[in-house]
């Protein structure tokens, strides 16, 4: 096991990270880690929060792509911009940014869940699809067969889908576009075979298998194997089970009762003793490794459901292996928030969303006060852990949450949303690196 270089005694109080002055993280998004979370920069100044809400490294800029001034889907309430993706393939590839909106029926009057679209060339933003029975739309991904998959993060459905009326939790949907036009919706179908769950992360491998999670404090990780590539109407859903009752080590995918999975996949997973993790949220695949953000995981005490969180790695081989890739106290500090005049310790807490960086690094954003964005290096020494986890950005908007981190075609630009902002103006932003003309590569 990697030596615990970040385990700090309770008496230590630091606001900066010890490596901030010594490290340069290379790649297209080359950066010097920022010194600390935005504890000292927290503000309610609307001018700042609507223009430069992030503390970012030198050599980077931040700008708004779309906010509620050019598209206000839910007047009088936050739009809850959540996940991002672009049309990654096909005609006009890279031109359109799609977003889910994590709005729930508790707001009134409820106008229904929505997917919006931003033309990255013109800046025009519009609703792509909206339906009165959609709740808390969250996960979103562009498929290799040029459709969108999106899903509801719902534990107990208040507005059942008319085509899946017995489902007890959230559903996953597939949006199909008109031929050669990624701005026109041709059809939207519910995909109950992928389970009724509190969905968030969605990932797809080279074989067309789809991975999903259940965002429960005892949530499982799932794999759907379709009968035919690109056809999600039939197939088998599996849940991940680590052998010998452990959380890490050799694992297997266990087939679920498909009738039960379409009603409540959580119950189906529990019936086969699938391994539970504390609030699995987003998923990201890099090569043959699937990463999962575990928001409240305690890697030391599995009974604790209020842990600091961790990043899990699952190898997508014939015999999967499961390990903690980012673990507070091992390769990143624990966070200790400042109290009154006592300074805090900048650290890792409540990881939520993940993104594959342009050079294969894993990007992580927290669901936490002063949401931090971290970058985890690959595990080159093969000990299971990232070889380094570095602080890229931190949010000055304390009541808000950074979410939906995503890289499109431009390797120098990170998309990120800000939801439930102090300003009441939820937004989608781009954080970009200024590339010098003298650079021939990174």
Where are the regions that the model predicts?
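Gram-negative bacterial Sec-dependent N-terminal signal peptides
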Residues: 1-19
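Sequence/structural signature of beta-propeller domains
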Residues: 20-442
């Amino acid at each position: 096991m990697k030596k615990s270089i970040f385990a700090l005694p309770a008496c230590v109080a630091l606001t900066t990270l010890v490596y901030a002055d010594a490290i340069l993280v290379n790649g297209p998004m080359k950066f010097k880690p920022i010194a600390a979370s935005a504890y000292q920069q927290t503000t309610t100044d609307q001018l700042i929060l609507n223009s430069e809400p992030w503390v970012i490294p030198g050599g980077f800029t931040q700008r708004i792509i779309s906010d509620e001034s050019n598209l206000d889907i839910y007047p009088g309430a936050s739009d809850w911009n959540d996940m991002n993706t672009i049309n990654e393939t096909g005609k006009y590839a890279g031109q359109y940014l799609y977003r889910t909106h994590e709005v729930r029926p508790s707001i009134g009057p409820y106008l229904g869940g929505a997917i919006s679209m931003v033309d990255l060339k013109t800046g025009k933003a519009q609703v792509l699809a909206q339906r009165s029975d959609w709740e808390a739309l969250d996960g979103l991904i562009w498929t290799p067969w040029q459709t969108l998959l999106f899903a509801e993060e719902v534990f107990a459905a208040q507005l059942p889908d008319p085509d899946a009326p017995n489902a007890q939790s959230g559903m996953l949907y597939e949006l199909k576009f008109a031929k050669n036009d990624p701005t026109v919706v041709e059809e939207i179908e519910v995909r109950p075979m992928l389970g009724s769950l509190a969905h968030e992360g969605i990932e797809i491998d080279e074989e067309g298998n789809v991975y999903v999670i259940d965002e429960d404090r005892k949530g499982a990780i799932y794999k759907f194997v379709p009968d035919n590539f690109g056809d999600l109407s039939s197939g088998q859903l599996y849940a991940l089970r680590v052998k010998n009752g452990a959380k890490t080590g050799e694992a297997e995918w266990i087939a679920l009762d498909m009738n039960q999975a379409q009603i409540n996949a959580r119950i189906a997973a529990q019936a086969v003793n699938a391994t539970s993790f504390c609030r699995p949220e987003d998923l990201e695949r890099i090569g043959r490794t699937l990463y999962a953000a575990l928001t409240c995981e305690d890697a030391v005490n599995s009974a604790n459901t209020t842990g600091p969180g961790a990043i899990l790695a699952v190898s997508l081989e014939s015999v999967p292996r499961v390990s903690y890739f980012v673990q507070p106290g091992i390769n990143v500090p624990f966070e200790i928030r400042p109290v009154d005049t006592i300074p805090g310790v900048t650290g890792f807490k409540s990881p939520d969303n993940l993104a594959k960086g342009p050079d294969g690094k894993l990007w992580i954003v927290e669901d936490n006060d002063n949401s931090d964005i971290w970058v985890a290096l690959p595990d080159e020494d093969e000990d299971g852990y990232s070889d380094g986890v570095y602080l890229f950005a931190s949010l000055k908007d304390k009541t808000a949450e950074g979410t939906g981190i995503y890289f499109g075609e431009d390797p120098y630009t990170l998309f990120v949303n800000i939801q439930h902002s102090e300003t009441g103006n939820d937004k989608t932003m781009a954080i970009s690196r200024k590339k010098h003309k003298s650079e021939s590569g990174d």
